Amino acid sequence: MSLIQEIKEQVLQGNQIAKAEALQLYGEPLEELCLAADEIRYQFCGNRFDLCTIINGKSGRCSENCKYCAQSACYHTEIEEYPLLAVEKIKEQAKYNEERGVLRYSIVTSGKALNDTEVEHVCESVREIHKESKIKVCVSGGLLNETQFRKLKQAGVTRVHNNLETSRQNFPNVCTTHTYEDKIAAIRAAWKAGIEVCSGGIMGLGETVEDRIDLALEVRKLGVKSMPVNLLNPIPGTPYEHNPVLTTEEMRRIVAVFRFCFRMHGFALQEEEGFSRIKEDPALHPGQMLQFQETC
């Protein structure tokens, strides 16, 4: 029995794999690895997947210096800049997406964190959406505190998004205006407020294979149930504009190994980059996508 099959059987029996096993899997034959990951996906997730999309609710002028990000005020990316969209605009887009079969709709905003006034604006938008729609609403509002998360939950937000982006070791190479611990603190605050958390990372930030595995295991340790696996789209004007884009084969390998690490988790994958061809995922992102203009 091959190494892939041995570890697959352990996972199918409900066991978690360790870092050493994940690193071993990364170097195994791709097609066998993907087929084994698909067996794990089918046993624990079936053929169910969710459709989700986003609205760029607030754009540009971010104080943070994340090297991949078009939203940062530190770089000249010619991105459109605007404050929080009107409640009616946010509601209209929610209804538009629900009519097209989307189950989750996320209000994504630029900046380190929404202030209290902005949080209330988002809450009002969510309440208005739920007057006319049953779509589930998520929010990506940065490094919020527990009180702010509780307000979002009371308004009807079911999930918040906060990517770790990369491993703890690699993070200082990506951003220096906030820390890994800042992100983890926000994720834990969301949990305390009783909101589900979506957290993952971007592949192609100069990370090593070990960094990718460390990210996956950090997310698993935090108890996150939905993990975005994003591919860097190098934005002109950012420090990472010349970073090489990972191949589809490399992304397949990453998602397959992550499936071994997360047997029951959902993966959120970008439809535009051909991830719909990766059959290990139970969740695909359709519709409007940002060019990694993510908040903290």
Give the ranges of each region predicted by the language model:
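Flexible, acidic/Gly-rich N-terminal and inter-domain linker regions that tether
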Residues: 1-64
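Conserved, mostly hydrophobic/aromatic
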Residues: 14, 37, 66, 162, ...
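C-terminal accessory regions of radical SAM enzymes
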Residues: 18-20, 25, 29, 48, ...
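Core AdoMet radical
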Residues: 74-93, 97-187, 196-200, 225-230
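Short, electropositive alpha-helical surface patch
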Residues: 119-127, 155-161, 208-225, 252, ...
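Flexible glycine/acidic-rich beta-alpha junction loops that bind and position SAM and/or redox cofactors
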Residues: 149, 172-174, 203-210, 225-246, ...
